[in-house]
Amino acid sequence: MTISGAGAIPGGEITIDASKSSQFLSALLLIGPSMVNGITVTHQGGELPSMPHIDMTVAMLRDFGATVTVDRAAQKWSVAPGDLRGVDLVIEPDLSNAAPFLSLAMVCGGRVTIADWPRQTTQPGDQLREILTRMGATVEFTNDGLQLTGGASIHGIDIDLHDVGELTPSIAALAALADSPSHLRGIAHLRLHETDRLAALTREINGLGGNVSEEESDLQIDPTQGALHGGTFHTYEDHRLATAGAVIGLVVSDVLVENIATTRKTLPDFPGLWSSLLQ
């Protein structure tokens, strides 16, 4: 794709279908202040995925001085033209990246503490606290950060992950090791991520002896208890598939995660960090 800039973008009104990814909407909003006439974006299509990410975009724009108007009922977002102001920020850690590390304590027992977990945040990854509690963990804030203590077993879960789809691979890995079935719903948009994550998770977990059935927007995961066995867990160049395979490999012997280096996209030294927690 070749883009030839003309020095300024007029802006105005545009209608898009962002039902496959909220990033289309967020990207347009972020450049709204620099447009001559600002921008008004109307979503027309299926249900918007990952709404918390859109809310984060709006909050960040406002922090920098942008004027943003949101009409939820009309599915319309407007950003006025204008200069942004510089502000000092503390960049929060990406909470979704903590999912495999928190999962480790649930699978192996013991506890894991994640330092610098914000007590107040707009990140959808913060929902891990509630999700993993429902799956049997004890989660609490301490002076050192967020501490998760594994329970006696991992419980299955029936949950809509529409707004937190990036957590699905780790939740699916835990569900494959749970003591009861799980139903992960509202995640059709994951078919258009780095790979078709629903198809990939189904194929790879089943390839290790699991029992995952795939629907258009859901995964049904029925634990097979001791039937899981070793094998190659393919990643499809997808960092979250790689970490899901690593979680299963904690308790299933001889699991080889193919191309673990793909985790460099978000966790430059995932193998080193992972190994340090297993010693």
Q: Predicted segments — roles?
A:
Residues M1-Q279:
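Short, structured segments at the rim of ligand-binding sites
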